[in-house]
Amino acid sequence: MELHGSLNMIGYGLAAIGSAIGVGLIFAAYINGVARQPEAQRILQPIALLGFALAEALAILGLVFAFVIGA
């Protein structure tokens, strides 16, 4: 049995799920850290946003690779 078509989209879906889990963990840790030490918000917020950007970049790269490989 041979599979054709949208297997690359399954890979993108897995990349998006991984990215979503990563973003959830990043902001859960950020909220937990700010709840424990509110004065550390100015230090933790840029780190959380950088982590968010890197996690979302992986999802965007997964989407790009899904379309490039599929073409």
Swiss-Prot record:
Record Gene3D superfamilies: F1F0 ATP synthase subunit C (1.20.20.10)
Residue numbers marked as site, Reversibly protonated during proton transport: E56
Annotated membrane topology: Multi-pass membrane protein
Record key words, sorted: ATP synthesis, Cell membrane, CF(0), Hydrogen ion transport, Ion transport, Lipid-binding, Membrane, Transmembrane, Transmembrane helix, Transport
Transmembrane residue ranges: 9-29, 49-69
PROSITE patterns xrefs: ATPASE_C
Pfam families: ATP-synt_C
GO function terms (MF aspect): lipid binding; proton-transporting ATP synthase activity, rotational mechanism
One GO cellular component term: proton-transporting two-sector ATPase complex, proton-transporting domain
Predominant localisation class: membrane
Compartments in which it is found: Cell membrane
Role summary: F(1)F(0) ATP synthase produces ATP from ADP in the presence of a proton or sodium gradient. F-type ATPases consist of two structural domains, F(1) containing the extramembraneous catalytic core and F(0) containing the membrane proton channel, linked together by a central stalk and a peripheral stalk. During catalysis, ATP synthesis in the catalytic domain of F(1) is coupled via a rotary mechanism of the central stalk subunits to proton translocation.
Family: Belongs to the ATPase C chain family.
Quaternary structure and partners: F-type ATPases have 2 components, F(1) - the catalytic core - and F(0) - the membrane proton channel. F(1) has five subunits: alpha(3), beta(3), gamma(1), delta(1), epsilon(1). F(0) has three main subunits: a(1), b(2) and c(10-14). The alpha and beta chains form an alternating ring which encloses part of the gamma chain. F(1) is attached to F(0) by a central stalk formed by the gamma and epsilon chains, while a peripheral stalk is formed by the delta and b chains.
The protein's name in its UniProt record: ATP synthase subunit c
Source organism per UniProt: Micrococcus luteus (strain ATCC 4698 / DSM 20030 / JCM 1464 / CCM 169 / CCUG 5858 / IAM 1056 / NBRC 3333 / NCIMB 9278 / NCTC 2665 / VKM Ac-2230)
Organism classification: Bacteria, Bacillati, Actinomycetota, Actinomycetes, Micrococcales
